[in-house]
Amino acid sequence: MDLDLRKVRYFVVLAEELNYRRAAERLYVAQPVLTRQIRSLERDLTAQLFERGRAGTRLTDAGRPARRRRAGRRG
């Protein structure tokens, strides 16, 4: 499966911020664009990566390993 690198970047920034508004600002995109791209990535992977609720956004069990793998690549 070929993943869109833009979607992966959006995932990484959202996983760091855990806030759609701040992540969208960092990425210089509108919040609805970020939301659509994350949902599209979740469909591509057939896994929910984030839980969204009144208490905010957090990584799901499926999203946490992906975030750790990405963090491990930083030098």
For every predicted segment, state its role:
Residues 4, 16-17, 31, 42:
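Acidic-residue sensor for enzyme active/binding pockets
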Residues 4-7, 31, 56, 63, ...:
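The N-cap/first-turn positions of alpha helices
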Residues 7-14, 66:
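Short alpha-helical "packing" element that flanks the helix-turn-helix/winged-helix DNA-binding module
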Residues 13, 25, 39, 43, ...:
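Regular, well-ordered alpha-helical segments
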Residues 14-30:
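Short helix-boundary/capping micro-motifs
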Residues 42-59, 64:
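A short LG(V/I)-centered, amphipathic sequence patch enriched
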